[in-house]
Amino acid sequence: VFTRLFGNNNNHCVYNGDITANGCGKMADFTLKALGEIKKLGATHIWYTGIIEHATQTDYRRYNISPDHPAIVKGKAGSPYAIKDYYDVDPDLANDVPGRMKEFENLVHRTHRSGLKVIIDFVPNHVARQYHSDAQPDGTTELGANDDPNYSFSPYNNFYYIPQAELRAQFDMKEGAAEPYHEYPAKATGNNRFDATPNINDWYETIKLNYGVDYLNGGTCHFSPTP
Protein backbone atom coordinates (compact mmCIF):
# COMPACT_ATOMS: atom_id res chain seq x y z
CA VAL A 1 0.00 0.00 0.00
CA PHE A 2 1.25 3.49 -0.89
CA THR A 3 1.16 4.91 2.63
CA ARG A 4 0.63 8.55 1.65
CA LEU A 5 -2.47 7.68 -0.39
CA PHE A 6 -4.20 5.46 2.15
CA GLY A 7 -6.46 7.61 4.32
CA ASN A 8 -6.25 10.71 2.13
CA ASN A 9 -9.92 11.47 1.51
CA ASN A 10 -9.39 14.65 -0.49
CA ASN A 11 -11.62 14.37 -3.57
CA HIS A 12 -10.60 17.74 -4.98
CA CYS A 13 -6.90 17.33 -5.70
CA VAL A 14 -5.34 19.80 -8.12
CA TYR A 15 -2.59 19.25 -10.66
CA ASN A 16 0.85 19.77 -9.14
CA GLY A 17 -0.75 20.71 -5.83
CA ASP A 18 1.23 20.73 -2.61
CA ILE A 19 0.39 18.94 0.62
CA THR A 20 -1.85 21.80 1.74
CA ALA A 21 -3.98 21.61 -1.41
CA ASN A 22 -4.01 17.86 -1.99
CA GLY A 23 -3.54 16.42 1.47
CA CYS A 24 -1.59 13.34 2.47
CA GLY A 25 -2.41 10.07 4.18
CA LYS A 26 -0.86 9.50 7.58
CA MET A 27 0.54 6.49 9.40
CA ALA A 28 -2.18 7.03 12.01
CA ASP A 29 -4.83 6.31 9.34
CA PHE A 30 -3.95 2.62 9.66
CA THR A 31 -6.15 2.15 12.71
CA LEU A 32 -6.78 -1.19 14.37
CA LYS A 33 -10.15 -1.28 12.61
CA ALA A 34 -8.62 -0.59 9.19
CA LEU A 35 -5.90 -3.18 9.73
CA GLY A 36 -8.49 -5.67 10.92
CA GLU A 37 -10.44 -5.24 7.69
CA ILE A 38 -7.25 -5.78 5.68
CA LYS A 39 -6.61 -8.93 7.70
CA LYS A 40 -10.12 -10.18 6.81
CA LEU A 41 -9.16 -10.02 3.12
CA GLY A 42 -6.78 -12.89 3.80
CA ALA A 43 -3.62 -10.80 4.04
CA THR A 44 -0.75 -12.03 6.18
CA HIS A 45 1.61 -9.10 5.59
CA ILE A 46 1.23 -5.43 4.73
CA TRP A 47 3.85 -3.71 2.61
CA TYR A 48 4.11 -0.04 3.55
CA THR A 49 5.65 1.87 0.65
CA GLY A 50 7.26 5.26 1.12
CA ILE A 51 7.99 5.07 4.85
CA ILE A 52 11.69 6.00 4.80
CA GLU A 53 12.39 9.73 4.49
CA HIS A 54 12.73 10.70 0.84
CA ALA A 55 13.21 13.89 -1.18
CA THR A 56 10.20 16.20 -1.18
CA GLN A 57 9.25 19.76 -2.08
CA THR A 58 7.42 20.19 1.23
CA ASP A 59 9.34 22.68 3.37
CA TYR A 60 10.29 21.23 6.76
CA ARG A 61 13.11 23.61 7.61
CA ARG A 62 11.32 24.60 10.82
CA TYR A 63 11.98 21.03 11.95
CA ASN A 64 15.67 21.22 10.94
CA ILE A 65 15.10 19.07 7.86
CA SER A 66 17.09 20.45 4.94
CA PRO A 67 15.02 21.33 1.84
CA ASP A 68 15.41 19.65 -1.55
CA HIS A 69 15.89 21.56 -4.79
CA PRO A 70 12.64 21.29 -6.81
CA ALA A 71 14.49 20.45 -10.05
CA ILE A 72 15.53 17.07 -8.64
CA VAL A 73 12.27 16.09 -6.95
CA LYS A 74 9.61 14.23 -8.94
CA GLY A 75 6.32 15.95 -8.18
CA LYS A 76 5.62 17.88 -5.00
CA ALA A 77 5.66 14.87 -2.68
CA GLY A 78 8.68 13.25 -4.33
CA SER A 79 9.51 9.69 -5.29
CA PRO A 80 9.45 7.26 -2.34
CA TYR A 81 12.53 5.64 -3.89
CA ALA A 82 14.69 8.78 -3.67
CA ILE A 83 15.80 8.10 -0.10
CA LYS A 84 17.05 11.18 1.72
CA ASP A 85 17.81 9.66 5.13
CA TYR A 86 17.97 5.92 5.78
CA TYR A 87 17.66 6.55 9.52
CA ASP A 88 14.41 8.55 9.47
CA VAL A 89 10.81 8.34 8.30
CA ASP A 90 8.87 10.60 5.93
CA PRO A 91 7.57 13.66 7.82
CA ASP A 92 4.64 13.93 5.38
CA LEU A 93 3.21 10.78 6.97
CA ALA A 94 3.19 12.09 10.54
CA ASN A 95 0.53 14.06 12.39
CA ASP A 96 3.29 15.28 14.72
CA VAL A 97 6.48 15.79 12.71
CA PRO A 98 8.88 15.83 15.70
CA GLY A 99 7.26 12.60 16.90
CA ARG A 100 7.30 10.87 13.52
CA MET A 101 9.52 7.97 14.61
CA LYS A 102 7.20 7.21 17.52
CA GLU A 103 4.24 7.27 15.11
CA PHE A 104 6.07 4.73 12.95
CA GLU A 105 6.77 2.51 15.95
CA ASN A 106 3.09 2.72 16.88
CA LEU A 107 2.15 1.73 13.32
CA VAL A 108 4.34 -1.36 13.53
CA HIS A 109 2.84 -2.21 16.93
CA ARG A 110 -0.76 -1.86 15.66
CA THR A 111 0.03 -3.97 12.62
CA HIS A 112 1.43 -6.76 14.77
CA ARG A 113 -1.53 -6.53 17.15
CA SER A 114 -3.76 -7.08 14.13
CA GLY A 115 -1.98 -10.32 13.30
CA LEU A 116 -0.10 -8.91 10.30
CA LYS A 117 3.60 -8.75 9.52
CA VAL A 118 5.32 -5.57 8.31
CA ILE A 119 7.30 -5.10 5.09
CA ILE A 120 8.89 -1.77 4.11
CA ASP A 121 11.05 -0.76 1.14
CA PHE A 122 14.77 -0.50 1.92
CA VAL A 123 15.92 0.79 -1.52
CA PRO A 124 19.65 -0.08 -1.46
CA ASN A 125 20.47 0.75 -5.10
CA HIS A 126 20.40 4.54 -4.98
CA VAL A 127 19.62 7.60 -2.84
CA ALA A 128 18.33 11.12 -3.42
CA ARG A 129 20.77 13.49 -5.08
CA GLN A 130 20.80 15.66 -1.95
CA TYR A 131 20.99 12.79 0.51
CA HIS A 132 21.64 14.08 4.01
CA SER A 133 20.99 12.26 7.25
CA ASP A 134 20.10 14.32 10.30
CA ALA A 135 19.16 11.20 12.25
CA GLN A 136 22.15 8.92 11.73
CA PRO A 137 23.71 7.42 14.90
CA ASP A 138 26.76 9.02 16.44
CA GLY A 139 29.94 7.71 14.86
CA THR A 140 28.26 7.08 11.51
CA THR A 141 29.87 8.72 8.47
CA GLU A 142 27.63 10.54 6.00
CA LEU A 143 27.38 8.85 2.60
CA GLY A 144 30.02 10.29 0.29
CA ALA A 145 31.78 12.30 3.01
CA ASN A 146 35.11 10.54 2.43
CA ASP A 147 34.77 10.01 -1.33
CA ASP A 148 37.46 11.10 -3.77
CA PRO A 149 35.44 12.58 -6.68
CA ASN A 150 38.52 12.68 -8.91
CA TYR A 151 37.89 9.01 -9.69
CA SER A 152 34.89 7.86 -11.71
CA PHE A 153 35.14 4.64 -9.73
CA SER A 154 36.95 3.72 -6.55
CA PRO A 155 36.00 0.77 -4.34
CA TYR A 156 36.38 3.14 -1.40
CA ASN A 157 33.82 5.65 -2.68
CA ASN A 158 30.11 5.55 -1.87
CA PHE A 159 29.13 7.04 -5.24
CA TYR A 160 30.20 6.98 -8.90
CA TYR A 161 31.45 10.25 -10.39
CA ILE A 162 31.86 11.95 -13.73
CA PRO A 163 35.11 13.80 -12.92
CA GLN A 164 35.49 17.44 -13.99
CA ALA A 165 31.94 17.54 -15.34
CA GLU A 166 29.01 19.52 -14.00
CA LEU A 167 25.58 17.92 -13.97
CA ARG A 168 23.76 19.23 -17.05
CA ALA A 169 20.43 17.46 -17.06
CA GLN A 170 18.32 17.67 -20.22
CA PHE A 171 15.48 19.55 -18.52
CA ASP A 172 14.86 22.72 -16.50
CA MET A 173 17.41 22.81 -13.69
CA LYS A 174 15.64 25.65 -11.87
CA GLU A 175 12.01 24.48 -11.73
CA GLY A 176 10.92 27.74 -10.16
CA ALA A 177 13.83 28.07 -7.73
CA ALA A 178 15.92 31.23 -7.51
CA GLU A 179 19.04 29.36 -8.66
CA PRO A 180 19.52 26.21 -10.75
CA TYR A 181 20.50 22.97 -9.05
CA HIS A 182 24.27 22.63 -8.98
CA GLU A 183 26.23 19.39 -8.76
CA TYR A 184 29.96 19.24 -9.41
CA PRO A 185 31.35 16.86 -10.20
CA ALA A 186 28.24 15.10 -11.43
CA LYS A 187 27.37 11.75 -9.91
CA ALA A 188 26.07 8.73 -11.81
CA THR A 189 22.27 8.57 -11.91
CA GLY A 190 20.40 5.72 -10.20
CA ASN A 191 19.40 3.81 -13.35
CA ASN A 192 23.06 3.23 -14.34
CA ARG A 193 23.45 6.48 -16.23
CA PHE A 194 27.20 7.10 -16.06
CA ASP A 195 27.27 10.53 -17.66
CA ALA A 196 26.41 14.09 -16.66
CA THR A 197 23.32 14.52 -18.84
CA PRO A 198 20.35 12.51 -17.54
CA ASN A 199 17.00 13.22 -19.17
CA ILE A 200 13.43 13.36 -17.93
CA ASN A 201 12.98 9.60 -18.49
CA ASP A 202 15.92 8.70 -16.25
CA TRP A 203 15.86 8.30 -12.48
CA TYR A 204 17.35 11.77 -12.44
CA GLU A 205 16.31 12.46 -8.84
CA THR A 206 18.67 9.72 -7.60
CA ILE A 207 22.37 8.88 -7.52
CA LYS A 208 23.68 5.33 -7.72
CA LEU A 209 25.37 3.74 -4.72
CA ASN A 210 28.75 2.09 -5.16
CA TYR A 211 29.14 -1.39 -3.71
CA GLY A 212 32.56 -1.97 -5.21
CA VAL A 213 31.35 -2.92 -8.69
CA ASP A 214 33.26 -1.21 -11.51
CA TYR A 215 30.53 -0.88 -14.13
CA LEU A 216 32.81 0.98 -16.54
CA ASN A 217 35.31 -1.87 -16.74
CA GLY A 218 33.32 -5.02 -17.28
CA GLY A 219 31.53 -5.04 -13.95
CA THR A 220 34.60 -6.10 -11.99
CA CYS A 221 33.72 -6.79 -8.34
CA HIS A 222 36.17 -5.56 -5.72
CA PHE A 223 34.53 -7.19 -2.71
CA SER A 224 33.57 -10.81 -2.13
CA PRO A 225 30.79 -11.16 -1.43
CA THR A 226 29.46 -7.90 -2.86
CA PRO A 227 28.00 -5.92 0.07
Q: Can you describe what each PLM-predicted range is?
A:
Residues 150-152, 160:
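Active-site or metal-binding loop neighborhoods of secreted/extracellular toxin and effector enzymes
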Residues 1-117, 125-127, 131-136, 140-150, ...:
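N-terminal structural segment of carbohydrate-active enzymes
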